[in-house]
């Protein structure tokens, strides 16, 4: 399959923290939707191996969250380094979307893109330069139509694929209740 240039690539990363100069990617997941937000395919969910030393730099929130979800153990056992995870993700995306066509889609994807630029530059370059950031709509709704915010509840598992599915659902919710298309 050569892919459709109107398909959208959704991504979520879990990291050891928020600073790409110090912290590392520990999980990556992607999925592809069509332009109407129908999920076409889910990509690999990859725990990215990091050293015990790197994992030891996590703050309490990250230790609690990623240990509780089982991600820390998956990271320790993973055979994927940054580059292998990057290549596996690109191989999946090439089946669905031509390079340079899809904006990077998700929640707070500016943060994800900072980590991709540092640790997975080939994957970062696969995206169009634009962003489709659901958190922008959330912030606008909070200011302009706060009564709709309670209509969409996230589970908050902080597992990459769960978070992406929620982002797609959240955008569909805002499309109906905020943008009203």
UniProtKB/Swiss-Prot annotation:
EC no.? Answer: 3.1.15.-
Q: Hydrolase among the record's keywords?
A: yes
Q: What is its main location?
A: cytoplasm
Catalytic residues at: 129
Domain Exonuclease span(s) in chain numbering: 8-171
Q: Which one of the record's GO molecular function terms can you name?
A: 3'-5'-RNA exonuclease activity
- List this protein's GO terms for biological process: DNA metabolic process
UniProt entry keywords in alphabetical sequence: Cytoplasm, Exonuclease, Hydrolase, Nuclease
Its function? 3'-to-5' exoribonuclease specific for small oligoribonucleotides.
This protein is called what? Oligoribonuclease
Q: Which organism is it from?
A: Serratia proteamaculans (strain 568)
Give the taxonomic lineage as stored in the record: Bacteria, Pseudomonadati, Pseudomonadota, Gammaproteobacteria, Enterobacterales
The gene from which this protein is expressed is: orn
